[in-house]
């Protein structure tokens, strides 16, 4: 199934990377330096807590429909009251997964003043601008697939 380009809307998505230590930040949102090692490596102060970190948001063009409501119908194993929107896109076009973030109308905000940070995921170091989770409009609940197209079922994030 092809989706019409004229029906597509530009949205942004970010992949969940990992739970990482939370850094101490100053009044401007920049990380506070704890110390610098002899070889010049900067070590930032940590709060002792962990929080989820997401990849730098990427744009996507998808069919977007707000839905949900009070009906008792169930689709994809969810009541329509459990989700607020659905994305539809061609098979293999995007690789959205559960817990990804999606921005439809809100401005993307970044942790640490937009400074790029490094996150280690499965032994690989990934650089990200670390978007703020609550700046996103939705989180992906499910991604049912079919032969020619894929869907992403979205739940609104409380702001």
Task: Set out the residue ranges of the language-model regions.
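Short, intrinsically disordered N-terminal pre-domain segments
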Residues: 1-20, 159
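Short, conserved turn/kink motifs that form compact alpha/beta structural patches or helix kinks used as
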Residues: 3, 25, 30-31, 36-159
């Amino acid at each position: 199934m092809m989706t019409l380009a004229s029906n597509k809307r530009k949205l942004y998505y970010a992949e969940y990377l990992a739970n990482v230590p939370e850094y101490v930040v100053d009044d401007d949102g920049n990380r506070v330096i704890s110390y610098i090692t002899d070889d010049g490596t900067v070590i930032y102060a940590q709060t002792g807590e962990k929080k989820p970190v997401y990849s730098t948001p990427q744009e996507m063009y998808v069919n977007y429909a707000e839905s949900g409501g009070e009906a008792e119908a169930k689709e994809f194993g969810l009541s329509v009251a459990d989700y607020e929107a659905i994305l539809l896109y061609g098979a293999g076009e995007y690789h959205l997964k559960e817990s990804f973030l999606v921005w439809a109308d809100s401005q993307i905000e970044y942790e640490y003043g937009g400074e790029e940070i490094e996150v280690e995921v499965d032994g690989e170091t990934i650089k990200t601008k670390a978007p703020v989770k609550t700046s996103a409009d939705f989180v992906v609940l499910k991604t049912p697939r079919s032969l020619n197209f894929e869907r992403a079922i979205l739940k609104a994030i409380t702001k």
